[in-house]
C-alpha cells in the first residue's frame, strides 16, 4: 500500500464559518462505535480534535481518567479549551501537536481516537504506528473516515456531480494519494495492530443522512460556504473549474437544498484495533 513520506501533505484549509457550522453537530456520537470499549479511569488521546466537540464527550466517558486532545492548528486548540471551560470539563488537556510525533512516552494511553484525520494525511500508516507506540499493550484505537469519492444525492444534475468531484480532487491534491477509506483494517494491520474489526455507516458532514428540508438546507449551505471560499479558490487556481462554473454549482446546491424530495448521504467507515 502506498504511503508517502509523513508530513508531506498540504494542510486541509477550512472556512471559519464552515467549521463552526459543521463542528456544532459533531459530538461524542461520532465515537459511538468505540464507546463499548471505553471505561471510566482510562487515559485517552483524541488526535485531530479540532474545536473539541467530540473530545469533551470522550472526556466524560473516561472520567475521572484523563482525555488529551491534539491538533496541529493552534486556533482549533484554543477553541477546544474555551469549549471545555464552558462545559466544565476538568479532566481534559488540549494542545497543539502532530500525530506523526506525539509528545508522549511509549505505552502511556489506554485508548486512542481519530475521526476524519487519516483521510487528510499523506502517510496514514506512519500516524497509526505512532498511535500504536503510545498505546499500552491491549490498548484500543477507534478510527473513522468518510468517503471523498462516493456520495448519494437525490435529485442530481451535472453541476452537483461536478461539485462532488471537486472534493475528491481536493483530497488527492492535499495528500498526494487516492482515498483509502475502504482500507482502514489494512492500514491498521500494516501499522502493527494484529486484531481489527470494521463497519460502515451513512453520514453527512454534520451527522446522520440528510432527509428533511431543514437538514438538506444545512448541507447545501455548508457546501456553498466551501465552494465560495477556500475550496473555490483552490479549484480556480488549479484549473479544476472557472468562477462561472463554481457559481453554477453553488446555485445548483441551493436549489437542491430546497427540493422537497432531496436526500444526501455518503459512506462512512469505522475501524477498531487492539495494540
Q: Where do the protein language model's features map onto the residues?
A:
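Conserved alpha-helix/loop element of class I SAM-dependent methyltransferases that forms part
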Residues: 24-42, 57, 61
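Conserved catalytic/acceptor-binding region of the Class I
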Residues: 142-221, 225
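A short glycine-rich, Lys/Arg-flanked "PGG" loop and its adjoining helix->strand segment in the class I
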Residues: 125-140
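Class I SAM-dependent methyltransferase Rossmann-like catalytic core
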Residues: 2-26
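A short SAM/SAH-binding and catalytic strip from SAM-dependent methyltransferases
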Residues: 110-124
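C-terminal helical/coil "lid" or tail adjacent to the Rossmann-like core of SAM-dependent
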Residues: 16, 199-263
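A short acidic, Gly/Pro-enriched loop at the edge of an enzyme's catalytic core
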Residues: 100-111
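Class I SAM-dependent methyltransferase SAM/SAH-binding core
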Residues: 6, 45-47, 51-101
Amino acid at each position: 500500500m502506498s504511503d508517502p513520506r509523513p508530513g508531506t501533505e498540504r494542510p486541509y484549509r477550512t472556512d471559519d464559518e464552515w467549521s463552526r457550522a459543521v463542528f456544532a453537530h459533531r459530538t461524542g456520537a461520532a465515537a459511538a462505535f468505540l464507546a463499548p470499549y471505553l471505561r471510566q479511569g482510562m487515559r485517552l488521546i483524541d488526535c485531530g480534535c479540532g474545536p473539541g466537540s467530540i473530545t469533551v464527550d470522550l472526556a466524560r466517558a473516561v472520567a475521572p481518567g484523563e482525555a488529551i486532545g491534539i491538533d496541529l492548528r493552534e486556533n482549533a486548540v484554543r477553541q477546544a479549551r474555551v469549549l471545555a471551560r464552558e462545559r466544565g470539563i476538568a479532566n481534559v488537556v488540549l494542545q497543539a501537536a502532530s500525530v506523526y510525533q506525539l509528545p508522549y512516552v511509549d505505552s502511556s494511553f489506554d485508548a486512542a481516537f481519530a475521526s476524519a484525520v487519516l483521510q487528510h494525511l499523506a502517510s496514514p500508516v506512519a500516524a497509526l504506528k505512532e498511535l500504536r507506540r503510545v498505546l499500552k499493550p491491549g490498548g484500543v484505537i477507534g478510527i473513522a473516515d468518510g468517503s471523498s469519492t462516493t456520495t448519494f444525492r437525490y435529485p442530481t444534475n451535472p453541476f452537483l456531480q461536478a461539485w462532488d468531484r471537486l472534493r475528491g480532487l481536493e483530497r488527492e491534491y492535499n495528500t498526494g494519494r487516492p482515498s483509502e477509506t475502504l482500507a482502514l483494517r489494512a492500514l491498521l494491520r500494516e501499522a502493527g495492530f494484529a486484531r481489527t474489526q470494521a463497519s460502515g455507516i451513512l453520514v453527512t458532514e454534520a451527522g446522520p443522512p440528510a432527509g428533511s428540508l431543514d437538514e438538506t438546507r444545512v448541507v447545501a449551505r455548508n457546501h456553498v460556504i466551501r465552494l465560495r471560499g477556500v475550496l473555490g479558490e483552490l479549484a480556480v487556481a488549479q484549473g479544476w473549474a472557472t468562477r462561472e462554473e463554481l457559481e453554477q454549482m453553488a446555485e445548483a446546491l441551493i436549489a437542491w437544498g430546497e427540493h422537497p424530495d432531496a436526500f444526501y448521504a455518503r459512506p462512512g467507515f469505522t475501524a477498531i484495533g487492539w495494540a
